[in-house]
Amino acid sequence: MYEEEIKKIALLNAYQHNGKAELKSVIGKVMAEIADLRKNPKLVSELAKAAVDSVNSMSKDDIVNIVEKQFPEALKKDKKPEEHRLPDLQGVNGHVVMRLAPSPSGPLHIGHTRMAILNDEYVKRYGGDLILRIEDTNPTNIDPEAYAMIPEDLEWLGVNVTKTVIQSERFDLYYSVAKKLIENGHLYICTCDREEFKRKKLASIPCKDRDNPPETNLYLFEKMLDGEIKAGAAVAVMKTDLNHPNPSVRDWIAFRIIDAKHPRTGDKYRVFPMMSFSVAVDDHYLGLTHVLRGKDQLTNTEKQRYVFEYNGWNKPYYYHYGMIRFPGTRLKTSLMKKGIQAGQYDGWSDVRLGTVRAMARRGYQPETFRRYWINSGLREIDAVFSWEIFNSLNREFVDPKAYRFSFTKDPVEIKMEGSNGLTARLPYHPSHPEYGVRKYEIGDTVYISKGDADKIADGERFRLKDLCYVVRKGDRFLFDGTEMKEKTKIINWCPPNSREFQVLKPDGSIDKGLIEPASKGYRGISQLERYGYVNFYDSDEKAYFTHD
């Protein structure tokens, strides 16, 4: 049913890669384009392998002829890719005001990029403001460096923030709103034991302080602010519905006392608002029109409804998207921070982490994040993040600019008997002759990877890519000319003056080998031929693995 469509993908891939289809690239493209197959990766692998094997048995000329005759539309440079459009927002009246609301516990990670990009896309569509609101109302969970790292990450992603607000600078506003709610009987001060309060709430029983008059509650709130009440001895509680089906929504805590210095305000404040209170107040006073958030915030949305209704405020439009699971990716900020402090990681950009800056170091492009989340949209169903699709998208952005180099992992030296000297002229990019070539004068010695060497059978003829043919005779390697006699395996190689090189991978492993001299001084994304894409970030001696 899908064989012809997958073969077309394999043919186009081979056309783009000098006549050889790359299996992993084809699998990624199939997963990205054929939605019905995404739930059956085993079938995708089988069908893609069959298509790649078939295409790779064809000559380059045959592939070019087929693609140019049968799929000319795919070759048009001005052909636009399939456009995925986010659904329209309801209730838009001229422009929108939207927000990003991270906690400054660390830099942004890949999970944060969804809310950043979706909000940015809507503000671009309708015009208006995108507010960065740093929610730093928990002084015990703040990394002071995050105040700078978060805007840096957003700038790298291409997100256009028009205004920045820091919640720790708005405590007087929160206190003012709280006092008004106390005066109107919607907020009370509870001095019950914490566990007793929790038990009563679960049983829908009011605590002893619930019906205290506003005057008493105002007096106690002022004593909390003045430092006359100890931490844990009193909290300010939003009066809701004790019979609400969700116990979390019943009389929820709006303020608590924390005796800890805040990185920005020091000990100026000791009564800190809980997230649902400060968020609702800010959403009103900042003029939010639309809020995008995960389904995990549905309970908080319901809690915040009381703040809006008690104050007579209009609520923004809320959209709750499904949760995304990121398999095999370290995203929990507290654990990443502990690992950094323990020396397990070399900082927030360590490629073993899932932070935005680690992804940038590996070579992922800002456009990849944007395309992926636009394609995912605002769906309410939970999903698993697809690294195959993500990598396939990134490959589209990096491949045209990725210079090609040769890397031999665990190198083995081979001497070609009968070689009188060869000249290799290797293009930096098979589709961009304007990038130039690497030129090497080869005597009789090259290096290949141990993995390739171990697979060469006695008597087998193989091709050193873009150089010559060689026949193995026991432990000897015999030069066998440059003319193709039959289809043979192609092996990557490095010249004798190659240098030692390492590729650092996100699973913590390191591949060591040799890399060709022409890579010296190169910075940016490269494709190490028949190995994968890497990012030459800051060194000639190492690169960071991006993906296959």
Curated annotation (Swiss-Prot):
All disulfide bonds of the chain are none
Main localisation: cytoplasm
Asked if the record carries the keyword ATP-binding, the reply is: yes
Q: What is its EC number?
A: 6.1.1.17
Reaction(s) catalysed by this chain's protein: tRNA(Glu) + L-glutamate + ATP = L-glutamyl-tRNA(Glu) + AMP + diphosphate
| Protein's cellular compartments | Cytoplasm
Top EC class for this record: ligase
Q: Is Protein biosynthesis included in the keywords of this UniProt record? A: yes
Q: Pfam families, alphabetically?
A: tRNA-synt_1c, tRNA-synt_1c_C
Q: Where is this motif: 'HIGH' region?
A: 102-112
Q: Which family does it belong to?
A: Belongs to the class-I aminoacyl-tRNA synthetase family. Glutamate--tRNA ligase type 2 subfamily.
- PANTHER family linked to this entry: GLUTAMATE--TRNA LIGASE (PTHR43097:SF5), GLUTAMINE-TRNA LIGASE (PTHR43097)
Q: Which HAMAP family match?
A: Glu_tRNA_synth_type2
Please describe what this protein does.
Answer: Catalyzes the attachment of glutamate to tRNA(Glu) in a two-step reaction: glutamate is first activated by ATP to form Glu-AMP and then transferred to the acceptor end of tRNA(Glu).
Q: What is this protein called?
A: Glutamate--tRNA ligase
Q: Which organism is it from?
A: Thermoplasma volcanium (strain ATCC 51530 / DSM 4299 / JCM 9571 / NBRC 15438 / GSS1)
Recorded name of the encoding gene: gltX
